[in-house]
Every structure is written in C-alpha cells, then in structure tokens.
UniProtKB/Swiss-Prot annotation:
Cofactor remark from the record: Binds 1 FAD per subunit.
Disulfide topology: 41-46
UniProt source species: Mycobacterium leprae (strain TN)
Chain's role: Lipoamide dehydrogenase is a component of the alpha-ketoacid dehydrogenase complexes. Catalyzes the reoxidation of dihydrolipoyl groups which are covalently attached to the lipoate acyltransferase components (E2) of the complexes.
Protein's UniProt name: Dihydrolipoyl dehydrogenase
Length: 467
C-alpha cells in the first residue's frame, strides 16, 4: 500500500508521536524517515546527552565532593565507557520507536521524501533497498523535518570545528574546547566536558549566560560554572574561527578589545534553523514565516488545508516535548477528534540538565513588568530546604512570578538539583488558571525539593513559612 490517510515526513519526537496518535484514531498511517528514527533527540541529542550528563555528575561528586559523603580512595573515569553507555541507551530507545510503529500498524518508509505535488511524496529509498523512488500518496501530511545547526556567520565546519552531533558521537575528548553559545546545548556540553577534565571556555554574544532565562538564574549558573573552573565570556563576539588542522584559533572581541583563544576543538552551539529546504515545499505552496519556518495555526495546520507541520520546522519553541504536543494536536485535528489548541509557547516548560538544573516556563520577572503586569514575586532558596541539604547540594532557588491582581502564575524560574522534575506542577497550575491562594492548599510531601514550590506559593500571598 502506498496511499495513506496520513503520511508523516520525519520520525523525530513529534513525527513518531503524531503517527501513533493518528493510528490510534483509526487512520492508515506511514512515516518517512531517511536516517534517525526517534529524531535527533533519541539518537544524538536529548537522550544520549542525559546519559553523559549523569556520568559527569557522578564524576563531579567523586572528584569534588567525595569527602562530604565519607568517600575516600582513588577513582578513575573512563569517558569511552560513558560514551558506550550513551549509545546503548540511545539504541534501546530507538528500538522502542520501531516497536511502537509495529504495535500501532504504522508503515515505516526508510528514505528521503519530497513533495512532487500537494498529495504526493517521492521517496528516495535508503541504501540496501531499490533505487527507484517510491511514490507515496496521502489525504493528509504532517511535516516534521526538524532543524539544522546554525553557524556563526562567516564560519564553516571542519575537522576541529564541530556541532553537537560530532561531539556526541566521539569516544575521544580534546584537552581543550571553546564552545560558542551559552544556551542549553553549550551549557550542557560544557558541564560534561569539564567534569571529564577538558579545559572549557564558553563564549556568549549576549550580556549573560543562558540569556533566555531570568536574569537571576543566569547570574547563579555563571557563579556555579565559575566554581567548577569553566570560563564564560559574555558580551563577546566571535570574529573568526580558524582551524589549522592541529588546533583552532578563535578571534573574539568585547567592548572594542580583541583577543585570540586557542583550543583543540570548537563546538558551535548558537541555535537551530528550521529544515525547510529540499522538501519541495515551494511546489505545494506552503507558506513560510519571516524567519523561514513553516507557518502554522493553533492546530498545526498550514495555509494548505491538508498539510500540517510540527516541531522545530515550525520555529516555535524548538524542544522535543513541544514537538510531541504539537504532534498529538495535529493528528487529532486531522481525525476530527476532540483536541486542544496550542497557542502560547511561552508557557511551555524548558530545562537544561547540567547540575544544578535550570528549569523554567512563562515570563521572566522583567518580561512580566515590561508586559504591563502588576507583578508579585516570591523566591525561596534551597539553602532553606532540608532535602537539598540531605542531598548535599543546597545551591539555587525557586522564583515564581505572578499577577498581583488575580494571583495566577505568569512564570517560574528555578535553578537547583534536579529542579526540572518540579516543572509539571507549575505548568499545570498555569494552564488551568489556579491561583496562589489555591495552590498553597496543595500539601507537599516532606522532605522533598517540591516544598520549595509550596513555600513560594505562600510567599506570593505574603506569608512564606520557612524563610
């Protein structure tokens, strides 16, 4: 069969989830994917990086905090074994995607698909299968082609100038590295590499690390990374990158002052651009935004009624869980099933998984004030949380921003041990318009890190208990 109710172009977190939901709703479904089943996330992104981050955390504990926990003796850390574990976990999750495709009777088409008309894809099949392109027709299609790494203007990749993909797929570590970009990817790789003995310098063009986070969170992560020995150069522009084969020279400037950084490797991590080229979108009239992303409405529908788009290619919030949520909505919209529109991507959760974690949703304090809200803020430090002390890591805080008039949450900003696990309570509260007065009555288990949320709920209405 080469005609389907729904064809999904791309098998990343959004694509495969959309396919499963479509199949659950009784639609004949196929997925077209040339390389990474499970997407960047499962193969060379979210999943293997979290394995490496956990290994790095253990290395940090044994090298920097062993005495605190009564641990003594020599320990060695083999990055090659950590790498092997990351690949094993990744491969297991990818196998899980194939299992789910089979379980839900979804057809896998291994190849590169492009539109030839509004209801047809021509698929160049992968090696080991017939070379003649496969013609696949459909009633509806979901574009889930993801994104590609943006590079510093005027620079190129080379043997020693790499992206996250090359770094996460190597067992060998450099002695030194310059990471361009202090967003989530730059921060996470900086944490991993430093804890395995690499000399790390992070260069950020904007005035602070993690510039999309609340200013107080940025200040705290800079402090914690400085304690680890990671150098962060903020407000610094990369002028050029030169790879001579044995090392890389990075020319940077700040306030009219120039310097040259020398390292074994340079990792470019300044962000991602939607993958819109080479798929024939122009042939079917799919509209793009000014930022060259596929333009969608709140139900993931493009300007062509039977063509939908999800994930990074839409240029919304480029995170795996956002793509998954979009995929569910797209499939339900196609099937005519009950669904819920997605509109305000500012309120989606986001996290960076170094230790301490950085986790947030919604408006920063400054954004809320700039937006004209009458703002109330509560901030609770983990130095006042018993569980954090028991874990040996009381760094960081929870900061909540609320509308003073109605008491509803506008944003949450956290830095601390595993605070990414605290986000769902906050985003659920925001989505269903719960107020601080209501939230404070939700009893939190003692002792847990989540008690910091309860303290902030108390703080928003003027009576924090334990601080």
């Amino acid at each position: 069969m080469t005609h389907y109710d729904v064809v999904v172009l791309g098998a990343g977190p959004g694509g495969y989830v959309a396919a499963i939901r479509a199949a659950q709703l009784g639609l004949s479904t196929a997925v077209v994917e040339p390389k990474y089943w499970g997407g960047i996330c499962l193969n060379v992104g979210c999943i293997p990086s979290k394995v490496l981050l956990h290994n790095a955390e253990l290395a940090h504990i044994f090298t920097k905090e062993a005495k605190t926990f009564g641990i003594s003796g020599d320990a060695s850390f083999d990055y090659g074994i950590a790498y092997d574990r990351s690949r094993k976990v990744s491969e297991g999750r990818v196998a899980g995607v194939h299992f789910l495709m089979k379980k839900n009777k979804i057809t896998e088409i291994h190849g590169y698909g492009r539109f030839t008309d509004a209801n047809t894809l021509s698929v160049e099949l992968s090696e080991g299968v017939p070379e003649t392109p496969l013609k696949v027709t459909f009633n509806n299609v979901i574009i889930a082609t993801g994104s590609k790494t943006r590079l510093v203007p005027g620079t190129l990749l080379s043997t020693n100038v790499i992206t996250y993909e090359e770094q996460i797929l190597t067992r060998e570590l450099p002695d030194s590295i310059v990471i361009v970009g202090a967003g989530a990817i730059g921060i996470e790789f900086g944490y991993v590499l430093k804890n395995y003995g690499v000399d790390v310098t992070i260069v950020e063009f904007l005035p602070r690390a993690m510039p999309n986070e609340d200013a107080e969170v940025s200040k705290e992560i800079e402090k914690q990374f400085k304690k680890m020995g990671i150098k962060i150069l903020t407000g610094t522009k990369v002028e050029s990158i030169s790879d001579n084969g044995s090392h890389v020279l990075v020319a940077v400037s700040k306030d009219g002052q120039f310097q040259e950084l020398k390292a074994d490797k340079v990792l470019q991590a300044i962000g991602f651009a939607p993958n819109v080229d080479g798929y024939g979108l122009d042939k079917v009239g799919v509209a793009l935004t000014a930022d060259k992303a596929v333009d969608i409405d709140d139900y993931m529908q493009t300007n062509v009624s039977h063509i939908y788009a999800i994930g990074d290619v839409t240029g919304k919030l480029q995170l795996a869980h956002v793509a998954e949520a979009q995929g569910v909505v797209a499939a339900e919209a196609i099937a005519g099933a009950e669904t819920l529109a997605l509109s305000d991507y500012r309120m989606m959760p986001r996290a960076t998984f170094c230790q301490p974690n950085v986790a947030s949703f919604g408006l920063t304090e400054q954004q809320a004030r700039d937006g004209g809200y009458d703002v109330v803020v509560a901030k609770f430090p983990f130095t006042a949380n018993a569980k954090a002390h028991g874990m040996g890591d009381p760094s960081g805080f929870v900061k909540l921003v609320a509308d003073a008039k109605y008491g509803e949450l506008l944003g949450g900003h956290m830095i601390g041990h595993n605070v990414s696990e605290l986000l769902p309570e906050l985003t659920l509260a925001q989505k269903w318009d719960l107020t601080a007065t209501e939230l404070v009555r939700n009893v939190h288990t003692h002792p847990t890190l989540s008690e910091a949320l309860q303290e902030c709920f108390h703080g928003l209405i003027g009576h924090m208990i334990n601080f």
